[in-house]
C-alpha cells in the first residue's frame, strides 16, 4: 500500500540545520521518514526548467513524490474574463514546472463567490477549468492531475461539494481535501469519526472508488472565526481548534486509500507530517 506524507514547503528547521538549496530538500526529508513534498508557487511560478529538473532528480534519488501548489492569483470564478484567462496561464506554468520536477499533481484554488451566487461562481469556475484542461492537452500536459482545493474562508468557492462537482469535469482531476479548511469553514464541524467518514463517502459516491483511493490532501490545525472561517494556520501543539488527524488515519485504513497527505502546519510542517505518518501507522496496528 503506497501512501505519501510530506510538507508544503520547508519547516523553520530546514534553514536552522544549515540547509539552503532546493536540491537539499530530499536529504532533509529523509531524516523524518517522509516521501512527499509540495513545492510552493503561491506567489508565482519563478523556478526555471533547469532548476526544476535538478530538484526533480534529487527528489527521485530519494523516492520523494513531488506535487506543486499553483499561484494564489488563480481565480477560476472571477467576473473578469482577463483574470480567468490569466488563471489558465498560471495553470499551464504550474504544469510545466511540476512536469520538469517529475511530478504530475498541481493544487489550485477555485476563486471567490463574494459578489455572485455560489452557483454562478461554480458555473464560471467549471467553464474556466474546461478551458484550462483543453490548454493542458494542447501543450502536451494531458497527464497532469489538477487538484482543486477545499477552502477555509466562507466566501471562497471550495466547499467539499463544490470541489467534488468541479472534479466531475474530467477523470484526471483529483480533489485536494484540506481537512483544516473544511473544519474552519464549518466552525469546528469535524470532530467525530462519522464527520470524516462522510467526507470519504461523498467523494466515493460522486467520483468513484478509484479517485477516492488516490485523493490529494492538505492537513493542518487552523484557527477560525465564527463568521468568516479560516484565520491562520497553527501547529500540532494546538489543543483548541483542531481538527485531529486520528479520524483521517482511521478512514484511510477503512477505505484502503493511498492518498498524498501534505502538512501545512505553520513552521513545523515536516515535523508534523512525521507525526501524521506515525498516527497512520499506529492506526493500522
Task: Specify the residue positions occupied by each region the protein language model found.
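N-terminal pre-domain/capping segments
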Residues: 1-96
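Hydrophobic faces of well-ordered beta-strands that scaffold small-molecule active sites
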Residues: 3-10, 37-39, 66-70, 106-108, ...
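Active-site beta-loop-alpha junctions enriched in small/polar residues
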Residues: 8-12, 40-44, 71-75, 111-113, ...
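Distinct, well-ordered alpha-helical segments
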Residues: 16-26, 48-56, 118-137, 153-171, ...
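Acidic (Asp/Glu)-rich catalytic clusters
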Residues: 25-33, 47-67, 93-102, 133-141, ...
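Active-site acidic/histidine proton-transfer and metal-coordination neighborhood
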Residues: 60, 77-177
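Acidic/histidine-rich catalytic cores of soluble enzymes
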Residues: 132-229
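C-terminal helical cap(s) of enzyme catalytic domains, especially alpha/beta-barrels
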Residues: 270-285
